[in-house]
Amino acid sequence: LHYPLRRQRQMCIRDSYYKAAGLTPYLDQLGFDLVGYGCTTCIGNSGPLQEPIEKAIQQADLSVASVLSGNRNFEGRVHPLVKTNWLASPPLVVAYALAGTVRIDISSEPLGQGKDGQPVYLRDIWPSSKEIADAVAQVNTRMFHKEYAEVFAGDAQWQAIEVPQAATYVWQDDSTYIQHPPFFDDIAGPLPQITDVSGARVLALLGDSVTTDHISPAGNIKADSPAGRYLRDKGVEPRDFNSYGSRRGNHEVMMRGTFANIRIRNEMLGGEEGGNTLYIPTGEKLAIYDAAMRYQADGTPLVVIAGQEYGTGSSRDWAAKGTNLLGVKAVIAESFERIHRSNLVGMGVLPLQFKLDQNRKSLKLTGKETLDILGLSGTELTPRMNLTLVITREDGSQEKIEVLCRIDTLNEVEYFKSGGILHYVLRQLIAS
């Protein structure tokens, strides 16, 4: 059983709950060991599948399913190879696991056979109201208070950590987990000027319901991905890659992981799955990170184009941070998820929304266009103002359309003018 928990101890409070309720022996017998401490299944850290199973899925391109009681059922979230995820209550998770398939009506079909060879139905194993009440009665707040009274004590390994005695964090150049981020490199300089975006290239042309997990995955790091290559170059073995979520303190890993979800579909490559794109100057297929670095090297600004509900899912700050570090100046979509839109503004990335019935399909965008965003230079930035998008196609023809700038509030205007909310806050502190 994997369940979300913020701290890890040898004897976890929820272990105590299960044991006090008398559930642990029965769960152990069924193979449901309590192993998922911290952010596990809901963030993609539930571990690998057995190798023969992984090979079978990949070789036959199987669409396999999971059943979980967490709060995330995005494609590939529980495991990159698991495309379909069903949310259910914990008892139903156990029931479906016993059945071994989701292609069953568990209200009427048996889950399996008992030792006596007779069919076992969900109604046979479902607890009564009294059984539930009796189990809950064994759990009390004293157990919670007892465990959390020692929340900062930690185990022997925690106590053995050597901490440098310094007023500020001592950065370690060889660390692959925490690196000095570049977000404040130019904080001592003047405020950045808000200017038009000229000659931008499309980094990715995406569809509807692109989640923050598509943008910045939190799960396993593939060995042949840009992040995997970076870690190997640093001497990290693939077995020790850990996950994007665990390495979120290292921007070098996280920017390489941006748009690296194996289930993302870039329409510039015909909608094939994987974090790749078409590098327009040469026509090469490259990892999105590699293409972005080439564009940065020659000073080419970048734009991401998407459909409806861009940025749904977890309010993952790295989905906006990574977008910024790749050199993306604007995201143009049909609609945005509220928090991610705000996070883009907070990282100095311009969220623009198509108007009326216009979208990437009606405009026949291929991703090979050059884009200009006009109306920023020499203009007082105001919430939800209109800007002009100039689309220059491969044949040199141009089309101008109006887009809505989704900087929605006066506070967001100030954040954007400062280069993002991090710069805004730090400049305010310096000024005071």
Question: In which residue ranges do the predicted regions lie?
Answer:
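Extended active-site and interfacial segments that coordinate phosphate-rich ligands
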Residues: 84-85, 90-92, 215-239, 321-330, ...
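Mobile "lid/hinge" segments at catalytic clefts and subdomain interfaces of large enzymes
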Residues: 15-16, 33-147, 345-350, 381-384
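N-terminal beta-alpha supersecondary unit
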Residues: 177-189, 198-297
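Single conserved hydrophobic/aromatic residue that forms the stacking wall/gate
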Residues: 1-9, 13
